[in-house]
Amino acid sequence: MRANGEPLFALESGDPIKDFDMIGFTMQYELSYTNILNMLDLAGVPLRAGDRKSLTPIVAFGGPCACNPEPVAEFADIIFLGEGEETTNTVLDLLKECKESGKSKQEFLEAAMHIQGIYVPSFYEDSYNPDGTLRALTPTHGAPATVKKSIVSDMNKCYYPDSFVVPFIDIVHDRAVEEIFRGCIRGCRFCQAGFIYRPFGRRV
């Protein structure tokens, strides 16, 4: 694609990714971070959030690895912390409102930072120790000192799509996934999922 000057496009419609209002990535594994940057580059979207001045596209990250967001903070406009079923619709409604009223990206981010579970990296100044470890994140622009993760209180009542738009290609391992519960009642100290998906939730 890069050699032929073909920008990354949506499988379903063929529309260029850079023309979307929001581009979202699930950070499932740390080793996929370079793939995220490669996709942004293929799409013709500037990699760093500071280089993207217009309101859209908003580049959003989320998923399990968002519990440690700093390695990718400079590339994301917003990062979803916690469970995204309810937060996603709130953010999309806000983005639609800002786009229709002609507001800037800065105004969108200043409103989004007040949504529980939304971390806006550009509103925090990081400082590091001599050994390279993070010393502090200092909030700016009135951002909260602590960003609390989003929690779905009732998995049976939260929004979930009834039908999915899926690409017309073979799926990985030819399998389907059904979530019957989230998290774990055991809380083993070595297990990330047992802690980041608390409190335990069940879908019936």
Where are these predicted regions, by residue range?
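Generic structural "secondary-structure junction" signal
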Residues: 47, 67, 120, 149, ...
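Homeobox/homeodomain signature
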Residues: 7-13, 69, 108, 145-148, ...
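Short, exposed beta-strand "edge-strand" segments with a Pro/Gly-rich flavor and a Y/T-containing core
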Residues: 12-14, 97, 101-102, 146-152, ...
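Radical SAM [4Fe-4S] cluster-binding motif and immediate context
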Residues: 152-204
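Active-site loop ensemble at the mouth of alpha/beta enzyme cores that anchors a bound cofactor
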Residues: 127-162
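Glycine-rich beta-alpha loop elements in corrinoid/cobalamin-binding modules
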Residues: 2-138
